[in-house]
Amino acid sequence: MNINTAYFAGGCFWCMTKPFDTFDGIEKVTSGYMGGHIENPTYEQVKSGTSGHLETVEIQYDVALFSYNKLLEIFFSVIDPLDTGGQYQDRGPQYQTAIFYTNDHQKELAETYIEQLKNTINADKAIATKILPASQFYKAEDYHQDFYKKNPERYAEEQKIRQEYKNKQ
């Protein structure tokens, strides 16, 4: 097995886990924080919007079974890449979108994907999703891990609200 790691910030990490977690070739999806200026941030620090971190998922995947481009497709299917203020009902800098690359190949694939996306969407706004070098990933508290499995009713409600928000746009 050849395991690689990818990092995506797509708003609330509760809503970002399941879309990736359900595919063969995805070994593990971990909720956490990346991009800020505080070591070992807590959820409360990140939630306040002052730590500089984005809620992020770390995805460990088998490159023989799953491509980075497929990860990009999934990521962009569940976010609004034009939203500068967060994602859907989740507002604030900690919910902004970003692709954190771990090597030049991931960076190039992300840049190419966004260029293609620009050509396919009809929008007056620029793509808000940033492409940034990966930095220290801090695993979120245990109660955030596998949220959709531990709290299916609350997860379903979050997804319903998110879908209603999408439909209004």
Curated annotation (Swiss-Prot):
The active site is at residue 12. Keywords: Oxidoreductase. Belongs to the MsrA Met sulfoxide reductase family. The keyword Translocase does not apply. It catalyses: L-methionyl-[protein] + [thioredoxin]-disulfide + H2O = L-methionyl-(S)-S-oxide-[protein] + [thioredoxin]-dithiol; [thioredoxin]-disulfide + L-methionine + H2O = L-methionine (S)-S-oxide + [thioredoxin]-dithiol. Its EC number is 1.8.4.11. It comes from the Bacteria. The gene is msrA1. GO terms for cellular component: cytoplasm. It comes from Staphylococcus aureus (strain NCTC 8325 / PS 47). The lineage of its organism: Bacteria, Bacillati, Bacillota, Bacilli, Bacillales. This is Peptide methionine sulfoxide reductase MsrA 1. The keyword Cytoplasm does not apply. GO terms for molecular function: L-methionine-(S)-S-oxide reductase activity; peptide-methionine (S)-S-oxide reductase activity. Signal peptide: none annotated.
